[in-house]
Amino acid sequence: RKVWLNEIIEYIKVKIENNQEINLNFICTHNSRRSHLGQIWLQMAAAYYEVELVKAYSGGTEETAFNPRAVAALQRAGFAVREGIGGNPKYEISSDLHTLRIVSFSKKYDNLENPKKHFCAVMTCSEADEACPIIFGADLRVKLFYEDPKSADGTDYEVNTYDERCFQIATEMFHVMKKVFMKLQKIK
């Protein structure tokens, strides 16, 4: 996994060195779980390490809804959540850290709210990776697959599985931003 994480680290580092905005779009099939967690945790880690040029997005090959189990995992991890209404509600995810605010809802990866060019496409599931052999506008495509917590839906270990996936993604996104931060400190 470190190889893929290092690709993301290097992408961010080069963009910073060139004083360019850094856009990463986390892509999964339904944009309901893993891609949202990747987006939110990367943005949180960027805020924590004060790497302000980083902007994280998410999308899917299909539009469904941000799964309430994944939302609940973020709440258990300490995020405040305000839920919208409808079949595909918009959630406002926030943290006291640097007044982080992210509006999350399920959308296709090429939605108007997502970057159209000069971004890193982070593929969080193999299904989306296979369904989209080409992501137009992406500077880089990284395969960073996560096991789908959906497999635990309705079981006794559902909460544990979602929390484990949330923690895994958080750990990896903080690793990425810590390495970027350390590289920036060496440059200064």
Q: What do the predicted segments below correspond to?
A:
Residues 1-188:
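Short polar/charged helix/loop
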